[in-house]
């Protein structure tokens, strides 16, 4: 996690902990998170609590700060799909839909790899596929996540605002 980010959770696992007066703390084993919160912060702009999905895992192999993470967490909101692209409004009976902003953390606890994804729970697979075809790069996914977390709306790419009258 980054400075200011926090993980709180409960779970279970088979752990071995070693500590002596002349040695550093050592931890071994896997801890499966059953319920928890990842407090995500980005500079002074975003502070959101993502719900950690059951089955997320922290694996310890000695130094607790070198633990490996495989954490999947979501932040739920409602957003208007037509902000992303007007054609998506044709695919759904309603344009305000539930959206899961998905935070994926893997790698070492000290320097995790962070990536994002989006889900449309309750929507059909075709609608989600179309949404993801519009968000086809990591940069665009990150931009969409930031807009959703800050403004509760999708980022509208510049090309969607153009029409044939703009050209001379």
Tell me the role of every PLM-derived stretch.
Residues 159-161:
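Charged, low-complexity interaction regions
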Residues 1-157:
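Strand-loop-strand
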Residues 163-168:
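Short, intrinsically disordered, charge-balanced linker/junction segments flanking boundaries
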């Amino acid at each position: 996690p980054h400075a200011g980010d926090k993980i709180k959770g409960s779970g279970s696992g088979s752990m071995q902990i070693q500590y002596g007066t002349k040695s550093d703390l050592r931890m071994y084993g896997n801890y499966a998170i059953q319920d928890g919160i990842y407090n995500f912060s980005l500079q002074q702009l975003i502070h959101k609590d993502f719900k950690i999905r059951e089955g997320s895992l922290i694996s310890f192999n000695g130094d607790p700060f070198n633990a490996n993470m495989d954490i999947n967490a979501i932040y739920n909101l409602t957003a208007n799909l037509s902000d992303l692209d007007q054609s998506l409004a044709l695919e759904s009976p309603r344009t305000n839909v539930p959206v899961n902003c998905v935070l994926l953390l893997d790698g070492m606890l000290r320097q995790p790899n962070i990536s994002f994804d989006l889900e449309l729970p309750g929507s059909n697979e075709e609608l989600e596929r179309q949404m993801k075809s519009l968000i086809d790069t990591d940069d665009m996914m990150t931009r969409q996540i930031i807009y959703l977390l800050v403004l509760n709306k999708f980022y509208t790419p510049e090309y969607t605002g153009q029409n044939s009258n703009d050209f001379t």
